[in-house]
Amino acid sequence: MAINKSSLQSRINNLSKKTGVHQNILLRSFFFDAFLKRLSISKYASNFVFKGGFLLSTILGINFRATNDIDFLLKNTALEEENIISIMKEIASLNVGDNVDLSYKDFQEIREEDEYGGYKIIFEGRLENIKETISIDIATGDPITPSDVDYKYKCLLENQILDFKAYNFETIIAEKLQTILARGILNSRLKDYYDLYIIHKLRWNEINSEILKRAFINTCEYRNTIYNKEEAFQILESVMTDNKMNSFWTNYKNKNKFVGDVKFKETTDVIKLVLDIIFKN
């Protein structure tokens, strides 16, 4: 559906007042939707599996979790620079009648935070004279236990539903927990702590404990990091008492309004509960 600048600004202003989410975050989400609409009608739709913060934002609500990029697991397609750029440009060029232009800007290898690699593709979204930069992160390889799930994505500013594949909750939790344990006090990804906390608070009744156990084992084996219960709790204890980690949490909370007044100890207490479930005989 086509939209003009005035209508977009009005809708974003109204939604910002309703949700308390900053207008810049909502504008970015609008351009994310522009990409997703194009992806959904492309021949590559089944090759992209939703994961990461954007998936959580759409499931939990943007007022509980905002993000700066969209994360995908790529399957049945080569994760090679030339191939990925070609695919992404083709997707962005599709016409969905929304009055939005997506221009390819850059391609970067991801190494800073993801030791397992991947690529970041950057587009500039434009509607009339409104511009916003969006990032699409793509990785491959990690196992999904038992498999990806059908996911119906609802666009932010309209009632359009897009069909995709997505991670299940158990695999999301398993990957975040593995990252927390693997990085210990060297972890600057405080979003993993918050994500486990908010999933536990809002959607834990949907978690299958046996699938979660298998997902954690599969993720750890794939990433060559095997933990027993004692090791896992020792790592978590060192994190809980580390001044730098507590300082990181304060900074993360101050930068992300959706975190509210959640304390770092509340997140680590939740992680203890999750570890108890995983290591329960």
Predicted regions: what they are:
Residues 55:
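Catalytic metal-binding/acid-base residues of hydrolase active sites
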Residues 1-48, 58-66, 70-281:
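Structured mid-to-C-terminal alpha-helical surface segments
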